[in-house]
Amino acid sequence: MPIGGVLRYNDLQTINRCRWFMIDSQLALFEGTIENNIVLGRSYIPYSDIRWALRFTELEEDIDAFPQVLKSNIQASGKILAPTHIMRILLARTILAHPQILIFDGILHNLQPTMRETGLRRLCSKDEPWSVIFVSNDQNLTPQVDRRIVRD
């Protein structure tokens, strides 16, 4: 299993960080509010975009159930977030940037099957502005993708 590498896109050796976003299998949030974990210091992001990201990731109802909604502290919420919640918060953070490329490295295995299928369908929709790269050995991704590359 490789531990490093280079990402090349259209023969460019360096890709502007605003144009791509990667989520790996290390599901980690930082201590702070749910909003801070999603917005990640990007104060220019409008509240309507945050709500869109919550709807896209099917987090809206769950987050709205917290006493302080988006202002709820990750550590002080009184319960430990499930890996599916953490993954969807990271996904919400990612799509807020409207990147051209989304890269997922083994993270989708943590989702429940129905949530996973819905998420894959939304992420891979032709209506979305991004291209998606999945680094995975999961054969079930095949129906959702246009092209599959197998590494020998």
Each model region followed by its residue ranges:
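Conserved post-Walker A segment of ABC ATPase nucleotide-binding domains
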Residues: M1-R55, E117-T118, C124-E128
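Hydrophobic beta-strand positions within the nucleotide-binding domains of ABC ATPases
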Residues: M22-I23, N73, V135
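ABC-fold ATPase nucleotide-binding domain signature/coupling loops
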Residues: F30, E60-I89, R93
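A short, proline-enriched helix->beta-strand linker immediately N-terminal to the Walker B motif
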Residues: L96-Q100, P129
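Catalytic Walker B motif of ABC-type/P-loop ATPase nucleotide-binding domains
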Residues: L102-G106
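ABC ATPase nucleotide-binding domain "signature" loop
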Residues: H109-L111
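Conserved catalytic loops of ABC-family nucleotide-binding domains
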Residues: T114-R116, R121-D138, T142-P143
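Conserved catalytic segment of ABC-fold P-loop ATPases
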Residues: P143-V150
